[in-house]
Amino acid sequence: MYLRKYINKKTKEIFEATPFLKINEKQILEYIYNNNGVCSIRDDNTLDIITVENKFIIKDEHVVIEESEHKYHANFGDIILRNIYKEGVYAFKVCTQEELRNEYSIKIWEK
């Protein structure tokens, strides 16, 4: 419960400080680094992303994340795993909460 309250408080603060942002990979990562891993970003569809460690949890109906030449489609509740490579290239992998649970045997915080 504490985690949920903390996340809600942090995302509210970021929402108020960020009236409009067009989503892209660089902005997502910058916000994550600048806000201690908790992030809420608005685009035309009011995207809400919460991060825990290196996982993005999509809190909106649908979002497309563009990363170099690839586009990743994610839906509500999906998790996006982020890998960082030495060359500074970022890669994203979309998976569902169930897939992540099965792979890592962990309980994912849900809305």
Feature-to-residue mapping (PLM):
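N-terminal domain-onset segments
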Residues: 1-68
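Short, compact, well-ordered microdomains
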Residues: 67-111
